[in-house]
Design a protein with these regions (language model features):
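Metal-dependent active-site segment of extracytoplasmic phospho-/sulfohydrolases and closely related
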Residues: 264, 268-295, 300
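Feature for exported/extracytoplasmic and membrane-associated proteins, marking the mature portion
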Residues: 1-273, 291, 305-381
Length: 381
């Protein structure tokens, strides 16, 4: 296990080493952000089974260590995350604990604003850090895409971004599509939007199906279909919802984590050889209380867990300066205390993913919070 001090200090030499300049960013590399909306419980995902307070505070919510997927003598993955556990063993996943953004209150709306804009406080910044990341790369069409019904804040900004969400309706036939295209030809705005929509549909291809609601694995394959194309996007965001588990958490989280595992598996299968150049960040707006509540769930907390997954990831490690779960160690007598800034993790991962200067990347993505300047390299060279 690597602690925060090692994570931060080991890159002092890295900053002194020559870096590839901004204009030379490797655009065949791919970066995907999977957001867990609703405050995913990091203690239920990456389980600190060896902490003596864990089982006592979690009660019936505690995962039996005999069933958990043990990674070392301290942490285990939830038993639903078999695919991610395999990627960890293969050196293609790194796991981070006690992670938090600068936000310290407990509003989903405000916390997601901070997470997606890269600000220090809600509404300090108007555009999203992923859009600013796209602006650091050599310009190309179809540079970034959101897999969501509407464009998420993280991808809003000066750079044009596509969005795609599978429809529950049957596919329109080619004749109807042609008629609509002719109808919109005289309108500069609608014509452009329609062309973008048709291009997105074409990129989705046969994997999109047309049978309504897609499974997580199918969605992963559709997203991979976009990303794997030579002319496809290189930055993508996938929204997942349903992580706000105030009640019946044990069964709900088992389902949520199974879906996440299948989504990652779909991405890996669909990307094929492009998986080797792919980095996936999984993160949430904040964590949940250490102790279970009275309705079989947990309430809004502070620190949580995050993941970096992909063929490009220099994985097989857990990064955690573990604060402990004893009463004296908790934040506000209830929350896992954060020891690693999510902005530090994101900035370094993005710099590594696209071979950008780490200091400049941190300044562009997180201009107000000033994340730590250095860390060990997270991705393969």
């Amino acid at each position: 296990m690597l602690n925060r001090r090692g994570f931060i200090s080991s890159a002092a030499a890295l900053l002194a080493a020559p870096r590839i300049a901004f204009a030379g960013a490797e655009t065949e590399r791919r970066f995907v952000f999977i957001i867990q909306r609703g405050a995913a419980d990091g203690l239920h995902t990456l389980i600190p089974y060896a902490d003596p307070a864990y089982a006592r505070l979690r009660g019936a919510l505690a995962i039996d260590p005999a069933e958990a997927l043990k990674l070392d003598g301290t942490f285990a993955l939830h038993p639903s995350l078999t695919g991610i556990a395999d990627l960890y063993k293969a050196g293609q996943a790194s796991l981070f604990h006690a992670v938090a953004s600068p936000y310290r209150d407990r509003s989903h709306f405000d916390a997601q604003n901070v997470l997606e804009t890269g600000g220090k406080a809600p509404f300090d910044i108007k555009d999203g850090w992923m859009n600013r990341l796209a602006g650091m790369l050599p310009r190309r069409s179809n540079q970034a895409i959101a897999f969501a019904p509407t464009l998420p804040l993280a991808l809003r900004g000066a750079i044009d971004v596509a969005s795609y969400a599978p429809s529950g309706l049957p596919h329109a036939n080619d004749d109807l599509l042609l008629r609509v295209q002719k109808l919109y030809e005289g309108d500069a705005q609608l014509s452009g939007l329609w062309s973008t929509a048709l291009k997105a549909q074409g990129m989705a291809g046969a994997a999109a199906g047309g049978k309504g609601q897609q499974s997580p694995a199918e969605l992963g394959k559709v997203a991979a279909g976009f990303l794997a194309r030579a002319d496809g996007p290189r930055i993508a965001m996938i929204e997942t919802n349903g992580w706000d588990t105030h009640s019946a958490q044990k069964g709900r989280m088992a389902t949520q984590l199974t879906n996440l595992d299948n989504l990652i598996s779909g991405l890996q299968q669909g990307l094929g050889d492009a998986w080797r150049q792919t980095t996936i960040l999984v993160a949430t707006e904040f964590g949940r209380t250490v102790a279970a509540n009275g309705t079989g769930g947990t309430d809004h907390g502070t620190a949580s867990a995050a993941m970096l997954i992909g063929g490009a990831v220099k994985g097989g490690k857990i990064v955690a300066d573990w604060p402990g779960l004893a009463a004296a160690d908790l934040l506000d007598n209830r929350d896992l205390r954060p020891t690693l800034g999510l902005d530090t993790l994101v900035a370094q991962a993005c710099a590594d993913a696209f071979l950008l200067d780490p200091q400049r990347t941190a300044q562009v993505l997180f201009p107000d919070s000033r994340p730590d300047k250095a860390s060990s390299r997270l991705l393969r060279g």
